Amino acid sequence: MPVCLLVSEDNSHKPIELHHQQSVTLGRGPDTKIKDKKCSREQVELRADCNRGFVTVKQLGVNPTLVDDVVVGKGNQVSIKPGQSLYMVNQQYPYSVKFTEDTSRSKPSKRAQQIQSPTKTTADVSDSPPPPKKTTPPAGEKSESAGHWSQGLKASMQDPKMQVYKDDSVVVIKDKYPKARYHWLVLPWQSISSLKALRSEHVELLKHMQRVADQMVEQCPDAHKLSFRLGYHAIPSMSHVHLHVISQDFDSPCLKNKKHWNSFTTDYFVESQDVISMLEHDGKVQVKEGAGELLKLPLRCHVCGKEQTTIPKLKDHLKTHLPS
């Protein structure tokens, strides 16, 4: 049976061996050489499926663990395969996984806090990729990345009921949980996981995405009385690059918490033109360090800057700025 190795991409330590269906808890400590106190001592739980060639990553720590710039989220889990990158915390300390038939050549380090996998409960089966030939995935579960919600865009962009525009390069869909009266997503058909994966060769594609977004705004029946912004989340919650086209009324029942609000009204929301400019000048997109902390900022009105203590109070205040 193949053996899985967790490999530090910055070569800070020897590969860590992950045995088949055995849980390994990792974080700050001697095994990873991580000393950053923002990384919990028990930041992630990893479980390798050596037969099927993936590793399940469950975030245990408070600060974000990412897979290809997609936040896992505390208590959530996703799958990682060879070719993807796992960032232990806050887009730092990158790892990849490797499956090999003979571990004697690699001499991996001692496994950290390894625990023999207990018998799966019903909850375990619903939350993680099923073991081979034993459990049927729950109804409606998607095969890619164990059907995790972060992969939902890839299904939505193929759904004719969700599409409002498409051409050979892009598709526009309605956001499933709109945070304003008008909220669309422009997605390329080309598979691009995140802002971090963008390069200078993608400039023309992103310019086309922006032109399509501008057309959506121009065709909106309320464009004469509502303002719009076009941009990307610094650390997206969904896999696959997508450009938000969102009206600035934020009049929606789906806007429910501080993270929702701050993701569209702080520097966490990166303007489309700024992303294009970074690619033209630097050949890549630089996400500011600590961008995730912006989601914790106080609630402030995006129009007048007045601070509000709760989402309901913020929504009441926003009504004073709505066009008549």
UniProtKB/Swiss-Prot annotation:
Residues 150-255 form the HIT domain. It is found in: Nucleus, Nucleoplasm; Nucleus, Nucleolus. Keywords: DNA damage, DNA repair, DNA-binding, Hydrolase, Metal-binding, Nucleus, Zinc, Zinc-finger. Residues 100-160 are annotated as: Disordered. A motif (Histidine triad motif) lies at residues 240-244. PROSITE patterns: HIT_1, HIT_2, ZINC_FINGER_C2H2_2. Its EC number is 3.6.1.71, 3.6.1.72. The record marks 156, 233, 244, 259 as: Interaction with DNA substrate. Residues 175-179, 237-238 are annotated as: Interaction with DNA substrate. DNA-binding protein involved in single-strand DNA break repair, double-strand DNA break repair and base excision repair. Resolves abortive DNA ligation intermediates formed either at base excision sites, or when DNA ligases attempt to repair non-ligatable breaks induced by reactive oxygen species. Catalyzes the release of adenylate groups covalently linked to 5'-phosphate termini, resulting in the production of 5'-phosphate termini that can be efficiently rejoined. This is Aprataxin. The lineage of its organism: Eukaryota, Metazoa, Chordata, Craniata, Vertebrata.
